[in-house]
């Protein structure tokens, strides 16, 4: 039996006995053994599979450019990141901009503004729409990441990554959502149009905040795996699956305000299956990347 055949046989066996993901974890560990990490293969892996929790932060830091490709440099670079974090944090303390009572996600926002030259001296502090997006993402990232330094750098680079890499793609998400929802359930689209709700769905929550504050952090990290590794289209299929999952509830509502209000606060206890089905939908419509090793 060839090596590929053995791998396929083991994958099927593990899935049947309830150990789906064992082979995937082994594949990732092989990728992470190389001193020079292969970014393309890490991206492909992240597109195909959910990242194991024990490796997620490391992979995200590499894919978001917080850590370099060469692993031997990781300790030195991370020490530099830590020092930079402490310098910016201390600067905010010196100018009495933050205190021990300042909420952590607000500290992260002020640090980001100081680094990017946007820190305002006005009081109360002026909040722009993009700041609300930053805070929403920061709040969810804080639930995912224990270390403050890691958390800040991941928030900072995630926001920059989403704004720069997907600058053009973001403009198409609204249309793509309507297209794929219509393919899956045209009657549901017709109901949304008849209720004048289609143009008033919580698109900012979905496509700007990347579902931060909508899905539980434990579910959302599997969606963000796909974002970090290069696909913002996954957001479309999460939105589509939310509508499909709550079709009966949505079709029982007949005005835009009530539909929007419900979709902004969906029950968090059902978000894991929604994400799993959304990823399946994404693979169904967009294909599955070739195996990473």
Curated annotation (Swiss-Prot):
Pfam families: RabGAP-TBC. SUPFAM superfamilies: Ypt/Rab-GAP domain of gyp1p. The keyword Membrane applies. It comes from the Eukaryota. Keywords: Cytoplasm, Cytoplasmic vesicle, GTPase activation, Lysosome, Membrane. GO terms for biological process: activation of GTPase activity; cellular response to starvation; negative regulation of TOR signaling; negative regulation of TORC1 signaling; response to growth factor. It is found in: Lysosome membrane; Cytoplasmic vesicle; Cytoplasm, Cytosol. InterPro entries: Rab-GAP-TBC_dom, Rab-GAP_TBC_sf, TBC1D7, TBC1D7_dom2. Residues 50-231 form the Rab-GAP TBC domain. Gene3D superfamilies: Ypt/Rab-GAP domain of gyp1p, domain 1, Ypt/Rab-GAP domain of gyp1p, domain 2, Ypt/Rab-GAP domain of gyp1p, domain 3. One of its GO terms (molecular function) is GTPase activator activity. GO terms for cellular component: cytoplasmic vesicle; cytosol; lysosomal membrane; TSC1-TSC2 complex. Component of the TSC-TBC complex (also named Rhebulator complex), composed of 2 molecules of TSC1, 2 molecules of TSC2 and 1 molecule of TBC1D7. Non-catalytic component of the TSC-TBC complex, a multiprotein complex that acts as a negative regulator of the canonical mTORC1 complex, an evolutionarily conserved central nutrient sensor that stimulates anabolic reactions and macromolecule biosynthesis to promote cellular biomass generation and growth. The TSC-TBC complex acts as a GTPase-activating protein (GAP) for the small GTPase RHEB, a direct activator of the protein kinase activity of mTORC1. PANTHER family: TBC1 DOMAIN FAMILY MEMBER 7 (PTHR13530:SF3). This is TBC1 domain family member 7. The gene is tbc1d7.
